[in-house]
Amino acid sequence: MATNITMFLIVITLTSVAAQTFQYSRGWTNGKRDGHKTEDIRDLTNNLERILSPCQMNKLKYVLEGKPLNERLLGPCDTSKTRSTTNPSDTNTSAVKTPCSTHFNKHCYSFSY
């Protein structure tokens, strides 16, 4: 009986030591890590606002808030500036290939007729 209690106490002690070693060696600090400064977060936010359109920012906020997917979220943002070349004397419109204004996809083109 005494050996069982002794073994139990040894296991508890080793588990406690291992947990504390993991806590301090791996950086598990319950969110109190000083790795991110508020200035870095502000810079990142400003960069996102410069890169993403207002529609894309709203979609990102919607997803980060954990709201369910719907048609509004899955639909494309109207980020392209399309123009049509219409000759007043001609009723035909020609398709004009204009680049999308997204910064992530450099080969994105939209067509207007």
Swiss-Prot record:
A Gene Ontology biological process term: neuropeptide signaling pathway
Keyword check for GTP-binding: no
Source organism, top-level taxon: Eukaryota
Upper lineage: Eukaryota, Metazoa, Ecdysozoa, Arthropoda, Hexapoda
Protein name from the UniProt record: Pro-corazonin
Tissue expression from the record: Four pairs of lateral neurosecretory cells in the brains of late instar larvae, pupae and adults.
Task performed by this protein: Cardioactive peptide. Corazonin is probably involved in the physiological regulation of the heart beat.
Signal peptide: 1-19
Organism this protein belongs to: Galleria mellonella (Greater wax moth)
UniProt keywords, alphabetically: Amidation, Cleavage on pair of basic residues, Neuropeptide, Pyrrolidone carboxylic acid, Secreted, Signal
Sites of Pyrrolidone carboxylic acid modification: 20
Annotated Gene Ontology cellular component terms: extracellular region
Modified residues (Asparagine amide): 30
Region: Disordered, residue numbers: 74-96
GO molecular function: corazonin receptor binding; neuropeptide hormone activity
Protein family per UniProt: Belongs to the corazonin family.
Polar residues: bias regions: 82-96
InterPro entries listed in its UniProt record: Procorazonin
Gene: crz
